[in-house]
Amino acid sequence: MIKLESLQDPSPRKRRTKLLGRGPSSGHGKTSCRGHKGDGSRSGYKRRFGYEGGGVPLYRRVPTRGFSHKRFDKCVEEITTQRLNVLFNEGEEITLDALKEKRAIDKHAIRVKVIVKGELEKTFIWKDANVVLSQGVRNLIGVA
């Protein structure tokens, strides 16, 4: 025989769903648990994540820790002489735009530095002020 104290609440999967708008005796009739007027009573309304009813949200109450220069950093890329030998032909002009076009550097780069790795097998035209040559590359091409 089943006793009253031995009854258990059904598991969440078997629990009956809340029926809304089915008359006053259901306890969820008329406004369907949405209250009167305001955004929350309207269809399609969703409160954004972290909203605390107009109070100062947690992410603003907690103090910031540290500081990052990431958003202020200037994007300076490096490219090797070995890579330039592969990407460019003899006598070609090496510019920032040409390097971006060949996807040798990041599209957000504002300057590129050429560093030595292997020999410089071809001669190139260096006119772009944003393409900086390292001391080793200057020695290779004979520019002091």
Curated annotation (Swiss-Prot):
GO molecular function: rRNA binding; structural constituent of ribosome
Region of interest (Disordered), residue spans: 1-48
Gene Ontology biological process terms, A to Z: translation
A cellular component term, taken from the record's GO annotations: cytosolic large ribosomal subunit
Function recorded in the entry: Binds to the 23S rRNA.
Assembly behavior: Part of the 50S ribosomal subunit.
NCBIfam families for the chain: rplO_bact
Stated family: Belongs to the universal ribosomal protein uL15 family.
Protein name: Large ribosomal subunit protein uL15
